[in-house]
Amino acid sequence: MHHDPNPFDEGADDNPFSNGGGGGARRGGGGGGGGGGGGGKSQFSFGFGGLGGGSKGGATVDIPLDNMSDSKGKGKELLQWEADLKRREADIRRREEALKSAGVPMEEKNWPPFFPIIHHDIANEIPANAQKLQYLAFASWLGIVLCLFWNFIAVIVCWIRGGDSKLFFLATIYGMLGMPLSYLMWYRPLYRAMRTDSAFSFGWFFLCYMLHIAFCVFAAIAPPVIFRGKSLTGILAAIDTFSDHAIVGIFYFVGFALFCLETLVSIWVLQKVYMYFRGHK
């Protein structure tokens, strides 16, 4: 007698809960794990087998490990850079201590007090018998700084009142070059000469300081050589501008007085330094 197949009977291949299906799931999981080892890449693979068995329904999740290794490498580089920086700082401190122990003076910037840009310590570095003279020379340097600054202000007033714009640029050049050059060319050599008793420094000071006095005399006169002399607040420029604009003329007359005073003080300083040099030698 022929029996029809049971319609409610499921085949072994179609039953997801049969042993074959479980094996398929295990095979799918194993296939997913094996995929992570190929290609030589640093990654972690985790496979999920499909419910229907086999690797068709499997999903593989790859977790790259390169980011972890990169972060560790950067951390090592930062630590190495920090150690190198500390080593350099320690080396600098060791050299400074060695120079101090050897008696080499360490010049720290201390002037002006509100924004130190130069080293200046007459009370501790200049001999007591030369400190008064050094202070006088320092006043002479501050005097030329004041003269050039006032000259800049007066020329700006003249420019506003209708003067040539080139006067402004010339006054700016006088100020920007005259202030630092006067310090480097004659005041600093005199400071070094007083401190170290160097004949060469004294000679350099005398040469440059005479040029400084010549410039002060030229500025006090302001001959009509460049732009009728109005780029400097001398007597001739003051008379010329006063006839046109009284306010501008007053500014120029004040500048003329400052240059005259600076000339007289500079001649006095030159005489005093020369007498000190001759008497000291």
From Swiss-Prot:
Which keywords belong to this entry? Cell membrane, Coiled coil, Cytoplasmic vesicle, Membrane, Transmembrane, Transmembrane helix, Transport
- Native organism is Oryza sativa subsp. japonica
The organism's superkingdom is given as: Eukaryota
Coiled coil stretches, renumbered:
76-102
Primary localization: membrane
- Transmembrane regions listed in the UniProt entry: 140-160, 167-187, 202-222, 250-270
Q: Which PANTHER family match?
A: SECRETORY CARRIER-ASSOCIATED MEMBRANE PROTEIN 5 (PTHR10687:SF79), SECRETORY CARRIER-ASSOCIATED MEMBRANE PROTEIN SCAMP (PTHR10687)
Stated role = Probably involved in membrane trafficking.
The terms describing its cellular component in GO are: plasma membrane; recycling endosome membrane; trans-Golgi network membrane; transport vesicle membrane
What are the BP-aspect GO terms? protein transport
Q: Where does this protein reside within or beyond the cell? A: Cell membrane; Cytoplasmic vesicle, Secretory vesicle membrane
Q: What segments bear the compositional bias annotation Gly residues?
A: 19-49
Q: Name one Pfam family in it.
A: SCAMP
Name of the protein in its database record: Secretory carrier-associated membrane protein 5
- Annotated gene: SCAMP5
